[in-house]
């Protein structure tokens, strides 16, 4: 099964939410709810408020996303 077309946006984590969810403000000023990708959980990469991240979203639901990368 081919991977769906995904949209990637850089953003900043503004708030930590329960259940390993994060509120992320994207560069285009939209705010979304995102969770960490499985590889980030597996490698124990911590995400804190104020971190710059790369968020992956589907074109079907633009209010939720997945954090795939934390910039240094």
UniProtKB/Swiss-Prot annotation:
CDD domains found in the cross-reference section: S1_IF1
InterPro entries, per database record: NA-bd_OB-fold (IPR012340), RNA-binding_domain_S1_IF1 (IPR006196), S1_domain (IPR003029), TIF_IF1 (IPR004368)
GO cellular component: cytosol
GO molecular function, one term: ribosome binding
Record flagged with keyword Disulfide bond: no
Compartment annotation: Cytoplasm
SUPFAM superfamilies xrefs: Nucleic acid-binding proteins (SSF50249)
Pfam family, one: eIF-1a
Domain S1-like positions: 1-72
Keyword Protein biosynthesis attributed: yes
Main location: cytoplasm
Keywords associated with the record: Cytoplasm, Initiation factor, Protein biosynthesis, RNA-binding, rRNA-binding
Quaternary state and interactors: Component of the 30S ribosomal translation pre-initiation complex which assembles on the 30S ribosome in the order IF-2 and IF-3, IF-1 and N-formylmethionyl-tRNA(fMet); mRNA recruitment can occur at any time during PIC assembly.
Free-text function comment from the UniProt entry: One of the essential components for the initiation of protein synthesis. Stabilizes the binding of IF-2 and IF-3 on the 30S subunit to which N-formylmethionyl-tRNA(fMet) subsequently binds. Helps modulate mRNA selection, yielding the 30S pre-initiation complex (PIC). Upon addition of the 50S ribosomal subunit IF-1, IF-2 and IF-3 are released leaving the mature 70S translation initiation complex.
Entry similarity comment: Belongs to the IF-1 family.
HAMAP family (UniProt xref): IF_1
Name used for this protein in its record: Translation initiation factor IF-1
Gene field: infA
């Amino acid at each position: 099964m081919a991977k769906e077309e995904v949209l990637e946006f850089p953003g900043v984590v503004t708030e930590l939410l329960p259940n390993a969810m994060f509120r992320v403000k994207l560069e285009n000023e939209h705010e979304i709810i995102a969770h960490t990708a499985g590889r980030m959980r597996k490698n124990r990469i911590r995400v804190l408020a104020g971190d710059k991240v790369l968020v992956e979203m589907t074109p079907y639901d633009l209010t939720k996303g997945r954090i795939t990368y934390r910039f240094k």
